[in-house]
Amino acid sequence: MTTNFKTRYAVQKELIANISLAFESLQLQPAAGSTEKGWAVQEFAQASFNNADKIVLLDYMESNRVGFQGWKFGAAKNDNTKAVRVDDWLEEQTWLVHTLRRIKPSDVSASFMTCEDMAGILIGWFDGQGAIELKKHGIGTLRIDRNRIFVYNDESELYQKRAVFPLRIQVPQEISVQMSRVSEWTPGIYPV
């Protein structure tokens, strides 16, 4: 069955692309020919993240259906300034965004960017240009409270500290698709 429903994996790919765009837009990637490593983003389950010095990881937490009326953004017209009310239902997903940085004593200086700094930068991105970019793909973001950044010591030997903040997004799905799935899963039982 073909649907426009964004699966968790599809949403994750869009979030990874969005964060990569943040790194490019905010010039957090090293200049061409530089030996310095830039920030990278990948899914939480990838084992290769231990090889990176500066990394952002995405960890899916939960999803909730928040209602049959939501907002659909004008992605078809490439218009991200208006949202049209439609009878879609919204799935509200919560992702944890982890920022990690390998710290060596020789690295620390006045201009050293910590994992807390990167978490603050990404929150600003998701509350601004990043939200606009996600709207182009039909994903709405909820404002992030900056007080929700949690910083703790990482148990691994590679990273001494980790900053984590929750990212809540809303993903619409056509109600007709949802109703057909309900009837598939529960034959003979129909929603009122």
Where are the model-predicted features located?
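Generic recognition of flexible, low-complexity loop/linker segments
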Residues: 44-45, 84, 153-154
